[in-house]
Amino acid sequence: MKTPDQRPEDPEELVYADDAVVGRAFRFSAVALVVLILAGAGIYGLLKPRKAAIETQMTRLAAPVAAAMPAAPVPVARFTDITASAGITFRHENGAYGKKLLPETMGSGVAFLDFDSDGDPDLLFVNGTFWPGHAPAGAAPSTAALYRNDGQGKYTEVTRGSGLDVPLYGMGVAIGDYDNDGRPDVFLTTVGGGRLFHNEGDGRFADVTASAGVAGDPKDWSTAAAFFDLDNDGDLDLFVGNYVRWSPDIDAKVGYTIDGTHRAYGPPMNFEGAFPRLYRNDGSAGFTDISAASGVQVKNPSTGVPMSKTLGVAPMDVDGDGWTDLAVANDTVQNLLFRNHHDGTFEELGALSGFAFDSYGNVRGAMGIDACRFTQDGKIGFAIGNFANEMTALCVAQDTPGGGSHPLFADEAIAWGIGGPSRDPLKFGIFFFDYDLDGRPDLLSVNGHLEEEIGKIQNGQRYQQPAQLFWNAGDAGFSAVQPAQAGEDLFRPLVGRGSAYADVDGDGDLDVVFTQAMGAPLLLRNDQALGHHFIRLKLKGTRSNRDAIGARVKLTAGGKTQWRDVTSTRSYLSASELPVTFGLGALDRVGSVEITWPGGRTQTLTDVSVDRMTVVEEPQ
């Protein structure tokens, strides 16, 4: 009998005596494999009949070095649960009535956005609703919940009359000012397509889905979505990931059980995948669906079915050409990496780049994803939260001396100290953020299982699971943070799903929010008191998109360099704040800030004040 954690493609369980040693082996194996493939191509080129000699070039990869365990102590920086005191009363509704329909256990996302343009982050919780014909007697339909930040981290619910008080089986959220009017708009993914809400500027949102042309198909189960400027024309386009081909009837036919008797939530291998959608923003004319022509709809070459079961997406310029690419996290099919060809089309490079599979060549159950230039030399890393008994992936860009035709990545989770500790839990929301303001991005994972009764058949698993926080010690790797260092509230067991960050109380450090499936969210205030300095930057595009999504910011201070990329799309079905935060540690001044705006224009600042937010407008 297969349990929910024993997926057909799972490798046998291995016990590692030394994760760092194994990490080194994995990384060298990846390099060796690339070299063998290239060498094989060269041999074939020599033996193949030809009219003229062909010169074969081979890209040599620098040998990676496994990180040692951090010697520096993890700082004490506590998080405090302020959910109730902040005025948050939302509770997620999944409509479950005993039939175990898959959307019920997937939860929903959350977004920080400044919808009223008063300078502090408001909150939007995505919600499910009751299945048709199964609402409890007298129960009002559930909707998303909008909370206005009244300053100092106190919130007031303003959902009623906002236009977002519409019953939907909601999943995820993307935030972006698609019409460049200075107000953030909202796209909600749902079981049943997508919904676009235009921010009217008076606390109300108008449903413009039909006129904008972004509804998708009523049969779509849309999940992760992202606003980004695919063509560098100054307005935001929209990527919408879909999960699987699903309906209540299809779900009922799966007939999956957890113990041979009782029905359970069917694993995604039992459902056919679904293509994502890509919409080009054509200004006042609305959006144009370019999904098929753009190359983002990839078929399995053997079966012809969609090779997408998307739960996460991360926009990021992976090859440094000034055009935003897309990394897509898929559940039980290979992850996809789409390189932007500058003409409205994308090339899928997941397998070729080393991004698609784990170190054994297997697919994983990928959920949330985030991208960050987390090293001192600015290497891109993709953190991907995976299923239980699968490690969190940390796909790190590799040096390719002499150039190369495409980017290369290797999963270095074990070598960086993340792999082993992250293996057991079922990871959903995940993001990088510098919680202690020391100048190094840390990593937070929000966890929770799919099955309420999983502990009865797997002693090592629980439905409610604690979050995991990894402190970045620089080149020495990451250390798992303990409750004594970050507080008990952060590690309270939850049925965790979505997650996001923002500075909710204006003190400069980053606070976090988690969502639960069929439960209340958790809003955690960062109460670190380390005396570290910071700068916060809010970018405003003029020639580029108003949100400056796709901009890259490079900070130099004290002989060290940090990078941040502007996007709100992070984690699982969620959106974090747009302003970027740089921790400075004990430094109280900044050398320079270099901004590369979408499209490639650069701007350098040398007089940025510390310990405050600075608004930077793109030069005309």
Which residues fall in each region the model found?
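Gly/Ser/Thr/Pro-enriched helix-cap/hinge segments flanking short amphipathic alpha-helices
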Residues: 4, 14-31, 36-53, 75-78, ...
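Short, conserved, GDST-rich strand-edge loop motifs in beta-rich repeat architectures
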Residues: 56-57, 126-141, 242-271, 445-463
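Beta-propeller blade termini
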Residues: 107-117, 148, 169-184, 196-198, ...
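Repeat-based blade/solenoid architectures
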Residues: 88-109, 162-174, 213-226, 271-272, ...
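Hydrophobic beta-strand segments that make up the repeating blades of beta-propeller
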Residues: 79, 120-127, 181-190, 238-242, ...
